[in-house]
Amino acid sequence: MADPETAAKFKSKNAFPDPLNDPKCNPKSLVKKYLTPKVFESLKNKKTKLGITLWDCINSGVVNLDSGVGVYAGDEESYTLFGPLFDAIIEDYHSPYKLATGHNSDMNPAHVKAPDLDPANRYIRSTRIRVARSLKGYGLAPGVTKAHRLEIEKKVVGVLTSLTGDLAGKYYPLSGMDEKTRQQLVDDHFLFKKGDRFLEAAGINKEWPEGRGIYHNNDKTFLVWLNEEDHLRIISMEKGSDIGSVFSRLCRAVNEIDKKLGFQHTKKHGYLTSCPSNLGTGMRASVHVKIPHAKEHPDFENILTKYHIQARGIHGEHSESTGEDAGVYDISNRRRLGLSEVQCVQDMYDGVKALMELEKEAIAKKRSVFPEVLKNPEVKSLLRKYLTPELFDSLKDKKTAKGISLYDCINSGVENLDSSCGVYAGDEECYTLFAPLFDKIVEDYHSPYKLANKHTSDMNPEKVDAPNLDPEGTYIRSTRIRVARNVKGYALTPGLTRNERLDIERKVVGVLSSLTGDLAGQYYPLTGMDEATRQKLVNDHFLFKKGDRFLEAAGVNKLWPEGRGIFHNNDKTFLVWINEEDQLRIISMEKGSDIGSVFGRLCRAVNEIDKQLGFQHTDAHGYLSGCPTNLGTGMRASVHVKIPKASAHPDFQKICDEFHIQARGIHGEHSVSTGEDAGVFDISNRRRLGLSEVQCVQDMYNGVKKLLEIEKSTK
């Protein structure tokens, strides 16, 4: 709806902008509402000391008739010289605030009452608070000259690069930015784009991108945009729900910059910004929070109004929450002028707290009754088979010491009716507290194993009888053995808190980084991973993705990708996934058929990590895992082997059953071997619980050996 040519005609004559009376003009436009011919005539010949005219201020609203506000101030004086227009717009937009009242600032984080709302990370994904500021002694963004913009950049960068501690970081100028840096800032969601048509018409994009840039700290929790819509957008953010911590970091940074450079401020307007909508605090305090039930509650809008907050989808204004983000909303303060920064944050905090209480009430009500959807005929899960209404009622009110409930364990199977298992344990205690359910599922899945028997572990590679099956490489392409493990003293992955996940990452990386010899390598955290590293890990088939809908519903994906990462050795034959489905997936692999060598390397690594950290284990369950299917050894030992004749043999499935192995295509479960991979199968052990790791590997070895004998003998 931009029409710069028509606007230019009126501007060149310094005439009243008739396009504002066009039916296409937004009827809610504030410049349309308050710029009467009389007001225009009284102001049209005035200029600020920096040369800003009335037309400079209204041009964006005349060019873009769909504007909501429609004016931008070119400098501090614009707010007083053109007060008859600006004052009316400001008091309308920020109603019920009156400019005569005066604005007070408060950047003391101690004044906010904000204990962590969601330490278990069940609802709040992330927190972000930003303020807009403009330096004293310069025009606002639309009125800044090129020389002044460069001067602002130099001064601000000087202050930012002097910051220490958790605020210390690096500045990235947009001018001359190389592609690698640009891509990294895009991946981190830190890069800002050239302003839209509204900012273009206001004069904010002049000499783009010169004098613009991005500063962020080493932890990527503190960010400053230079010379975007305002001189400074100062941002503090982090995964999780510690609103107090995020505000505190912001206050320390803002107060330090203000002390050294000074911000434009008046008693009536608060901190000055180019757009009147950002006056006062210039603050937007927000969280991304999952509240699908609260959103549907009849009191939802009343709570928004009561606490002066607003809700939108997490992908920007007017966006909807869909897909994996369904039910996740961006909740932020609505007021900016006439209350302090502390009050803005408190508004948001109190409002989110009230919405979370609604959500918790709705969830508690839902979880108090048996999930009738499990009775649908298409549901074939073990959860459906064993969870009766009577059993549900006997367990529904119990919670582990870490706060895990029965419904936490069954939620994935209730949300995903095509689940085969349907339960995930949130911590070790789930296996005993909810044993009347878990025991049946475990014994069914791992039949004929009985939990009354004792599971024994054996990670001694010398006990495997596994001479190289295919030294010429005619049949076996590759060998891979992995185990799932979880560290003692923590919840299992679905029940981890943010701090626990980060602590596990730190501890495990410490151990992995101390490994020597053929196990020595490097850790690659998923958070902040640059594109070149990401692509390398993709090419090596080492990168893991965010968990699927089953893991999402189980709570495994919380605060993704924070605390997750990949370690691999220099030879690329030893790999560890940290905080994926389990806290550790430890993998040994290599081209060819030396199963004994692959298992030997795995044993050395697993035994060393176990010695330093310790793994969760019980006599009945073996090594613990979030999903009961991975209990016991947590092992999958496999080869990719070309056996077109053996796979066509009438006894193929019988042999697989006899040796407790399973066959599938090499591209994952349910895949079929076709094309150049025709006849190539992934052969792996089927049993995990009730036999040792040595026995799992021996099962796979013996089964593959038998299949190769058939392959070689079949004409």
Swiss-Prot record:
Residues noted as binding ATP in the record, renumbered to the chain: 126-130, 189, 233, 284-288, 312-317
GO molecular function terms listed in the Swiss-Prot or TrEMBL record: arginine kinase activity; ATP binding; creatine kinase activity
UniProt keyword annotation of Kinase present: yes
Protein's GO biological process: phosphocreatine biosynthetic process
Record SUPFAM superfamilies: Glutamine synthetase/guanido kinase, Guanido kinase N-terminal domain
Approximate repeat segments: 1-366, 367-715
Span of the signal peptide: none
PANTHER family named among the record's database cross-references: ARGININE KINASE 1-RELATED, ARGININE OR CREATINE KINASE
Family: Belongs to the ATP:guanido phosphotransferase family.
Protein name, per record: Arginine kinase
Species: Anthopleura japonica
